[in-house]
Amino acid sequence: MLMKTTAVHAPASQGTSGIVLDSLRVAYHGNVVLKPLSLTIEPGEVLALIGPSGSGKTTVLRAVAGFVQPAGGRILIGDTDVTHLPPYKRGLAMVVQNYALFPHLKVEDNVAFGLRAQKQPKALINERVTQALKTVGMSDYAARYPHQLSGGQQQRVAIARAIAVRPRVLLLDEPLSALDAQIRHNMVEELARLHRELPELTILYVTHDQTEALTLADKIGIMKDGSLIAHGETRALYQHPPNRFASEFLGRANILSAIALGITEAPGLVHVSCGGAVIRAFSRGSHHGYNKLLCIRPQHLSLTPRSAYSNRFNATLQSVHWQGDLTHLLCDVAGETVRMVLTHVNPLPRVGDKLALWFEPDDAVLIEV
């Protein structure tokens, strides 16, 4: 795969810079494609924006980059209002899929391109190029041309070119989507390592791949129909999604009908009628009422209790799907289908078996319909 990098032409400022979006709104020909959105990305933080096609995630990134003019609101990078500044004055770099490295330039010259555009001294250019190639593990390929590299190697060169200019902010727009699965997996690990080595770099990462987001991001924002419908720390958002769309888009989830009965003695937990049983579940909202939903991740269910406080559903096994290291079970729980994922199950239960499905109260989340 070939990548295009857009880099600043002015020296990046010292220190770290976060991003603040203040009621940012974007419209094309009068049609609103991004509803007023407020979001803060802390300095040195990796924020992943995920969502289906057309949700507005790439529009946010392009607005931050300066390629889309907002219809309202402000964009701040550090303490600077960049809303109306051209891209080259924003102190950022951007890696986008499906655009070529310069085919007539060697790897080292591709990486040096932004620095030369900045008219940096030759000694500084050589130092930055050497360091950037070392950071992405491409030092041995400095004299090669793009056509002599694999897709993953070309991508590393594109990222090296971006970080060589020492941007305040790095924007990544689905940079792994065109790579094969194994290369993509390796590059996710490489990007995680890159941020460990450059902890001062603020990264806005747009992807449709939830695994990339979960692996790389400190925080995740979930977009739908031009709105930010969920935002939070990665683990907390996965563990306790605020709504059905977030729970199902960020990983697989069982969604069951439920009735909230009232608070328990434990903070944050409520009694819930669900699946033919009264259980305890996490809730951040109303503690009473009908028309609630219960969210449980398939991997949070087990065939044995994990503690004295474990919840239990009685279930009938409908199907078994063995997939090597994992076994997927589909069960009937009070007329609703529940999926569970198990490891190292021996012996395997049989279709029609009566099972007890156990889960911890904090792994069950009460959400609104």
Curated annotation (Swiss-Prot):
Molecular functions (GO terms): ATP binding; ATP hydrolysis activity; transmembrane transporter activity
Record-level GO cellular component terms: ATP-binding cassette (ABC) transporter complex
Pfam families according to UniProt: ABC_tran, TOBE_2
Residues the entry annotates as binding ATP: 51-58
SUPFAM superfamilies in the record: MOP-like, P-loop containing nucleoside triphosphate hydrolases
Location(s), subcellular: Cell inner membrane
ABC transporter domain mapped to chain residues: 19-250
Tagged with keyword Transport: yes
Membrane topology: Peripheral membrane protein
Keyword Coiled coil found: no
Keywords associated with the record: ATP-binding, Cell inner membrane, Cell membrane, Membrane, Nucleotide-binding, Transport
Main subcellular location of this protein, as a coarse class: membrane
Alphabetized Gene3D superfamilies for the sequence: P-loop containing nucleotide triphosphate hydrolases (3.40.50.300)
NCBIfam families referenced in this protein's UniProt entry, alphabetically: PhnT (TIGR03258)
Similarity section: Belongs to the ABC transporter superfamily. 2-aminoethylphosphonate importer (TC 3.A.1.11.5) family.
Functional note: Probably part of the PhnSTUV complex (TC 3.A.1.11.5) involved in 2-aminoethylphosphonate import. Probably responsible for energy coupling to the transport system.
Cited PANTHER family: SPERMIDINE/PUTRESCINE IMPORT ATP-BINDING PROTEIN POTA (PTHR42781), SPERMIDINE_PUTRESCINE IMPORT ATP-BINDING PROTEIN POTA (PTHR42781:SF4)
Name of the molecule in the record: Putative 2-aminoethylphosphonate import ATP-binding protein PhnT
Organism of this sequence: Salmonella choleraesuis (strain SC-B67)
